[in-house]
UniProtKB/Swiss-Prot annotation:
Native source organism of the sequence: Mus musculus
Protein's UniProt name: Cell division cycle protein 20 homolog
Residue positions where Phosphoserine is found in the record: S41, S72, S92, S153, S161
PROSITE patterns given in the database record: WD_REPEATS_1, WD_REPEATS_2, WD_REPEATS_REGION
Modifications made to the protein after synthesis: Acetylated. Deacetylated at Lys-66 by SIRT2; deacetylation enhances the interaction of CDC20 with CDC27, leading to activation of anaphase promoting complex/cyclosome (APC/C).
Amino acid sequence: MAQFVFESDLHSLLQLDAPIPNAPVARWQRKAKEATGPAPSPMRAANRSHSAGRTPGRTPGKSSSKVQTTPSKPGGDRFIPQRSASQMEVASFLLSKENQPEDRGTPTKKEHQKAWSLNLNGFDVEEAKILRLSGKPQNAPEGYQNRLKVLYSQKATPGSSRKTCRYIPSLPDRILDAPEIRNDYYLNLVDWSSGNVLAVALDNSVYLWNAGSGDILQLLQMEQPGDYISSVAWIKEGNYLAVGTSNAEVQLWDVQQQKRLRNMTSHSARVSSLSWNSYILSSGSRSGHIHHHDVRVAEHHVATLSGHSQEVCGLRWAPDGRHLASGGNDNIVNVWPSGPGESGWAPLQTFTQHQGAVKAVAWCPWQSNILATGGGTSDRHIRIWNVCSGACLSAVDVHSQVCSILWSPHYKELISGHGFAQNQLVIWKYPTMAKVAELKGHTARVLGLTMSPDGATVASAAADETLRLWRCFEMDPALRREREKASVAKSSLIHQGIR
């Protein structure tokens, strides 16, 4: 019996087509097990180490193609982007919108939409920049390099490109004497009429200078010694001049007839600021009150605004007549409505960011909800406000007292008059508030600014008893001709409508 077992074992050992027991696993079998099965055990690794010096080259009958296995994680096709980051709905809407007819709309509808956009957003959406200035960005991490840096050109602007800057004379066009002008920051002593007549208050007198003919006329002189003129303001269209005095009076003069029409008394202290809104004359007093006067009726005092605790030194109606801005010695700026609300006369907005007296207040002529204000020596800032939202759009430290601010109707710029130490006028670009030019010449602080009716010349009155005329907003001749043609066409349409 043992003989048969021995023969069977011998036969199995000599048989070549049977698997060899305890032999190393073939390479193709080991690769297949590693791809589909668990990691090999230490025992199998030890068994393979005996035959590490000899590797079979090719297994008979086995194809050379590698066995394809299913990956454990889906890798994704690199030529197909992930749609989770794509705005497919927006793209579909834009593609479908291109096939629809364009909605041109009526001019009236477009004007209403633009007005709503200006009041709600503070800017026109159609003309706005995609990226708007919102503050200083955070610094990048140390060692960070922007991979998009190669997309931006480092070359200088070609010399053939058109220059965007214009020539601004650094010297005044004319210098007039202003003897005995009161060196008082809180007074408003100069104003330029639509008829091209400049009114200047010199102590107790008011003088008129006709810019066209050069004639000078003394309109009035205070009767009582010690009294003086504290403010002057022309009506928007006409020959009527309002005069505020130190004895709390508001006088109304017909300049053409050189006659005082009426004397309005309602204040208890000097009237340091005046502003017109059609037939309503608003006056600000040292008592902190603002009075509305209806110059058509005998009972002229129609309203009292109480929003300041000290002197109202800045007062200005908006060009559209919807808002009144007031600045006071209490460092407060109030924005008032044109009419009383449900709770009476209350300010729509109150700004308290200034740290000094606010005399300089000016409304943007092309954007009725934008207001510029300037603070005194303790503040030295110019701030731009959106009176609808109450937001401060920008604040610029000018390093000196701000006495007055004017907007240019021809350029998107504004000019400010300053005090110590340089007593200069500065032109700023809006809305970036970049400095365009500085006009120097006064030897004492600027007391007030006013602009000619054509918007080209600015008159500055200073404590050095001079009145300087600066032609800093001269309009381009081609642009002037275009505007003249547009005004003529508009007037002809009005006449046709009247007929």
